Amino acid sequence: MHINMISAISNQGKLHFLLYSDAIDSDRLISFMNAIIKTAAGRRVYLILDNLKVHHSNKVSAWAKEHETQIRLFHLPPYCPEYNPDEYLNNDLKRNLGTQAMVKTVQELEENATEVLNQFSADTEHVKSNFDHPKLKPYKLD
């Protein structure tokens, strides 16, 4: 039993997430990035992506080019999750879910994950702390 998540965090403590059951595709990623742009209040978004195949798709690349004044995509080197602050959020989510009672359905798992993520979202200092990992210190922006 599993769910998938796409998420983005900011060094200002903002968290955006989307839970889903099937595979990520270009359309879902583009929809997620559009939602992030809408919440940025006219500021340009700088989004760090890992090397998932969909992150490099022609459709996503073309969309990013069309929206380059609103969003800029950066790709991490391959096999370097330690440089992605969002990975620390994912690990924290898994730890929190692991302490809860065993779920019986995917719906219960999704509800629990949503509850934990909403708690994280309400705690901007907690979200910001994902940028405090020693591997990220040289890149931390205040």
Which sequence ranges carry the predicted segments?
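RNase H-like polynucleotidyl transferase catalytic core
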Residues: 65-85, 102
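Alpha-helix C-cap/termination motif
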Residues: 39-40, 66-67, 119
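Electropositive, glycine- and tryptophan-enriched low-complexity nucleic-acid-binding patches
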Residues: 1-43
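Acidic, metal-coordinating catalytic cores used for nucleic-acid/nucleotide bond scission
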Residues: 49-60, 78-83
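Generic beta-sheet signal
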Residues: 43-49
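C-terminal anion-handling pockets and recognition modules
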Residues: 86-142
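Structural signal for conserved beta-strand scaffold positions within catalytic alpha/beta enzyme cores
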Residues: 17-19, 75, 99
